[in-house]
Amino acid sequence: MADTMFDFMEMIDSDIMGKVLSQVREYDDTRFHASDVKNALGKDRLTFDDYSALLSPAAEDFLEETAARAKMETRKYFGSSISMFTPLYLANYCSNHCVYCGFNCNNNIRRGKLSYAEMESEMDAISKTGLREILILTGESRSQSNVDYIGEAVKLAKKYFSTIGIEIYPLNADEYAYLHRCGADFVSVYQETYDPDIYEKNHLSGPKRVYPYRFNAQERAVTGGMRGVGFGSLLGLGDFRKDAFATGIHAYYLQRKYPHIEI
């Protein structure tokens, strides 16, 4: 695992990464059968084994039943409402060399970033469509899209939107706290893959290469005061079942530790 920290990176004392990686190493989807899937679908509360069974090849014959159960759970907790948001890219500069990404720092593409006036013009136009939630994104470049720049963007967004999410490079807790004071509510970070070896092969250089720092980003965001955090994997880099399993239990462990947060 590539774990040489950059000087600016904050280390936190957390056992969540160890727990997740331990569970993933033990994951074996071949040990589940149709009876395990049926049993999981009939439960009110799932164990890790139940979750694994629903992700296993044995569950492929139960897609309709799984979709129906998922719909029921969604309606139970969220009703029939749908929350809509729009993404707004502020910049596409990046400091990382990720082999699968067109934004990577070695690609010869046109780069740019919005001025504050351009941001506000975009936000004004978006808000006039009736949307009240926005997701602010950048490429992962601290030099071209620094925290102050993003903070000013969040302040502008606060004039037009009731909910503001950010999907940028991972930050330290104090930087997340600053963006929260500016008006940000939610943070999304994609781990891409939870397999450390595959992660290292796909992230050749840049801060993103440091697996632990990225993994702990959501926890730093929570300690920085963010109301909610999002998780994700780029399915296909590694074993998609393992990565889906890891994404779910990463969120589970964080919510167990911080029960007040939204996932």
Can you say where each PLM-predicted feature lies in the sequence?
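Conserved C-terminal portion of the radical SAM core fold
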Residues: 138, 212-263
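Canonical Radical SAM [4Fe-4S] cluster-binding loop centered on the CxxxCxxC motif
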Residues: 76-118
